[in-house]
């Protein structure tokens, strides 16, 4: 078969297959054009998921008739005046989006340039061009795409439902809106709920307002401000508290010079920073902006411009990891307030005044049963208080008599308050100036030990304590191999493991930071964890795995009674320790309930 030149319309349709994958792809190109035109308001409307109609209206600088004529020609653009691909400062630059769309749909553009008396119109219907011609149009541009993929009907079979496609388009608008808070965005659809995002100041507070409008108000309550700079690369944004984690990475948004990207390097750096804090399979919420010289990043490496390449990827990754870790460390013991709100919701629903049908609560004492049913086992952690002892409860079954003395003023002023009781020998209840705090003693102490072990390893040499008689631990062959492979790593933490014949190892020294550890159990748990991790994990992940296992072994266990001074010491240590708001598995170590919220449970507010 001879080689022949392809028809120009066919060329455009092939190009459209790369650039325009779905309605959301076309919408993204149109919004980027509007932003490059300096628009301050962008209104989007779609019908049937974008298949029937995509309309984008902006108040940007607009185009003169001669520019409008060229705009629908292949590889015609106003965004590369110097022809330099190494210094791209606009969102669009290839000049192929509009002709690609016009080759597979009915594309109509109305535009009026600033200072022009009249606007112009051009239409391209599946590759057939009409115009430009004069048309009534306010300053700015209106682009309408009708019957998308009419020129390539086979592509329609690969689209999802109208609702799913509309949701994808809404997400595109939201993502670009987060990058440009100074622009007002409107979105209307026949398939999903629309929205209107008011313009905000292009400042940290203004951006947080825009992010909260997109990601929900809980993001504001759980967001930590991030800011760092290194060798001309600047990072700014907000990162969610580790205890406010999500089931997917959908709430992770990264922008490079104002361009939204889904780059593995950047998302991997965020994952590495949170590795110490999140449960397996959970993801942090964050919005990060990287700003650098356009010459330091290549944005022309992906058909949809969704990925970028940095000239120095190590610098960028190090900046993100370092900045996020420092931000999380500065948060100290802070945990998500959503945990307290969730606890209040559970209490409210289980309380005697809750109406399961959603109606008003019944507060009529005459209708209250004479002997209300309750589970006596639920009160097993409490003993009957002596008469007239409400001022100082002396006999919670698991109480360590923390209430025997009034809390000191200094402890009450502390963020986590003064310990008043221990419940079920597992939870510490403390009183603050404006509420109460409930602490999981094992989870909290586990995190404290974990951070101490990390600090000890960062020093010159972790202190050890030699065992008078080495502990001989019998293990499976795979476990012996795994723990001996990690022997050098374990020695950095002060744990010395030596081979002891087939199927066994000897523990000769343990970390001095671990008080009275069980060396046999510690070795077995470490071996099992290392085998489960396949031994092929990154070195940092293996460090964290070893640290977490050791910390768990030396933590205050649930079921251990604690004296008041021990409980208060634990609270003060939590306040001083970075990351103590969550345990090594990502669970919260405490829940805070404000007095005003507790009073609502009892109808006082």
Swiss-Prot record:
SUPFAM superfamilies reported in the protein's UniProt record: ATPase domain of HSP90 chaperone/DNA topoisomerase II/histidine kinase, DNA mismatch repair protein MutL, Ribosomal protein S5 domain 2-like
Keyword DNA damage (UniProt): yes
InterPro entries: DNA_mismatch_repair_CS, DNA_mismatch_repair_MutL, DNA_mismatch_S5_2-like, HATPase_C_sf, MutL/Mlh/PMS, MutL/Mlh/Pms-like, MutL_C, MutL_C_dimsub
Gene Ontology MF term list: ATP binding; ATP hydrolysis activity; ATP-dependent DNA damage sensor activity; mismatched DNA binding
Entry annotated with the keyword Transferase: no
Gene3D superfamilies: 3.30.230.10, Histidine kinase-like ATPase, C-terminal domain, MutL, C-terminal domain, dimerisation subdomain, MutL, C-terminal domain, regulatory subdomain
Gene Ontology cellular-component terms listed: mismatch repair complex
GO annotation, biological process: mismatch repair
Alphabetized UniProt keyword annotations: DNA damage, DNA repair
Purpose: This protein is involved in the repair of mismatches in DNA. It is required for dam-dependent methyl-directed DNA mismatch repair. May act as a 'molecular matchmaker', a protein that promotes the formation of a stable complex between two or more DNA-binding proteins in an ATP-dependent manner without itself being part of a final effector complex.
Alphabetized HAMAP family for the sequence: DNA_mis_repair (MF_00149)
Family of the protein in this entry: Belongs to the DNA mismatch repair MutL/HexB family.
Protein name in the entry: DNA mismatch repair protein MutL
């Amino acid at each position: 078969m001879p080689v022949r030149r392809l028809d120009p319309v066919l060329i455009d349709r092939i190009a459209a297959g790369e650039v325009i994958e779905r309605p959301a792809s076309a919408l993204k190109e149109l919004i980027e054009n509007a932003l490059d035109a300096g628009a301050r308001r962008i209104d989007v409307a779609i019908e049937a998921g974008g298949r029937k109609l995509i309309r984008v209206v902006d108040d940007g600088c607009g185009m003169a008739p001669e520019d409008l004529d060229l705009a629908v020609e292949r590889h015609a653009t106003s965004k590369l005046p110097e022809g330099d691909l190494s210094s791209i400062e606009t969102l669009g630059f290839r000049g192929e989006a509009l002709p690609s769309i016009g080759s597979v749909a009915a594309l109509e553009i109305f535009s009026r340039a600033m200072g022009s008396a009249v606007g112009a119109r051009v239409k391209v219907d599946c590759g057939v061009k009409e115009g430009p011609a004069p048309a009534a149009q306010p300053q700015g541009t209106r682009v309408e795409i009708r019957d998308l993929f009419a020129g390539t009907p086979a592509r329609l079979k690969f689209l999802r439902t109208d609702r799913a496609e509309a949701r994808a388009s809404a997400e595109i608008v939201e993502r670009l809106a987060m990058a440009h808070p100074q622009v007002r965005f409107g979105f209307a659809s026949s398939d999903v709920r629309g929205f209107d995002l008011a313009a905000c100041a292009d400042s940290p507070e203004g951006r947080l307002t825009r992010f909260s409008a997109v990601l929900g108000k809980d993001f504001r309550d759980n967001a930590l401000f991030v800011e760092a700079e290194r060798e001309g690369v600047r990072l700014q944004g907000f990162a969610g508290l580790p205890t406010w984690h999500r089931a997917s990475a959908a709430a992770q948004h990264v922008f490079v010079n104002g361009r939204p990207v889904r780059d593995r390097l950047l998302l991997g750096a965020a994952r590495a920073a949170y590795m110490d804090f999140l449960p397996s399979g959970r993801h942090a919420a964050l919005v990060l902006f990287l700003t650098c010289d356009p010459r330091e990043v290549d944005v022309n490496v992906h058909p949809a411009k969704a990925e970028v390449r940095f000239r120095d990827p190590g610098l960028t990754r190090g900046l993100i990891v370092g900045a996020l870790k420092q931000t999380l460390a500065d948060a100290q013991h802070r945990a998500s307030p959503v945990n307290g709100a969730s606890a209040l919701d559970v209490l409210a629903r289980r309380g005697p005044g809750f109406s399961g049908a959603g109606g008003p609560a019944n507060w009529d004492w005459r209708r209250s049963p004479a002997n209300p049913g309750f589970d006596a086992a639920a009160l097993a952690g409490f003993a009957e208080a002596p008469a007239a002892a409400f001022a100082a409860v002396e006999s919670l079954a698991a109480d360590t008599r923390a209430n025997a003395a009034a809390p000191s003023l200094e402890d009450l002023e502390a963020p986590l308050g003064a310990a008043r009781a221990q419940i079920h020998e597992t939870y510490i209840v403390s009183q603050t100036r404006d509420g109460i705090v409930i602490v999981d003693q094992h989870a909290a102490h586990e995190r404290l030990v974990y951070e101490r072990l990390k600090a000890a390893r960062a020093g010159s040499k972790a202190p050890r304590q030699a065992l008078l008689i080495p502990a001989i631990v019998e293990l499976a062959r795979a476990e012996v191999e795994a723990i001996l492979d990690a022997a050098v790593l374990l020695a950095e933490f002060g744990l010395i493991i030596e081979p002891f014949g087939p199927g066994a190892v000897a523990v000769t020294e343990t970390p001095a930071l671990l008080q009275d550890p069980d060396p046999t159990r510690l070795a077995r748990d470490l071996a099992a964890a290392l085998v489960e991790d396949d031994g092929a994990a990154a070195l940092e992940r293996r460090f964290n795995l070893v640290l977490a296992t050791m910390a768990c072994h030396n933590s205050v266990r649930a079921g251990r009674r604690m004296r008041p001074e021990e409980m208060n010491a634990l609270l003060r240590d939590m306040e001083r320790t970075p990351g103590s708001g969550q345990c090594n598995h990502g669970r919260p170590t405490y829940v805070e309930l404000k007095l005003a919220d507790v009073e609502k449970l009892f109808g006082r507010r």
